[in-house]
Amino acid sequence: MVSRVFVLVLMLALAGCGWHLRGSMPGMPSLDGLAVSVESVFGDGDLPSELRRQIARTGAVVVPPRAGVPAMRLLDEQVERRRVSGARGAAEQEFDLDYTVTWELIGADGQRLAGPVRLEQTRSLIIERDDLLGSEGREELLIEDLRRDIVFQLVERLQVLAGDALTEDE
């Protein structure tokens, strides 16, 4: 009985504080049926593919780039590793991984609606001299996590901008 009450109180507390799962943005404008394209000037790698997938999950129809369709244009993607601490010969070195994406949103009429905007995410990484393979794997996982965070932000901004455009048209 006590555990049921605890679970109920916990659920109410989480609902009341505004907490929600990543990817579930309550109150965000719907993209249902909106045709949008994703263009990348640096090729069709992991970021554009993940962005298309997540935009499609919002209900939008992701189409190839063409005139008359709004486009989220990815202008630049960079991953930089900066040493924070630890000498070159030390057993452990700490780095910051910086993941940066520059983007813009082009309206169906070809006019720029937003951007260019630069988004940046940073995570810390410790590389151990005795575990280089494990450290490399951790670095790849961190980069994937950073990419997911950036994609989440891009989709959220697209939803806000699409909502603004829809309310201006009404």
What are these language model-derived features?
Residues 26-28, 64, 111, 117:
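Short secondary-structure boundary/capping segments
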Residues 73-118, 124-140:
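Surface-exposed short loop/turn segments
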Residues 60-71:
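Short acidic low-complexity segments
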Residues 13-58, 163-170:
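A structural "domain/chain start" motif
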Residues 1-17:
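Sec-dependent bacterial lipoprotein signal peptides
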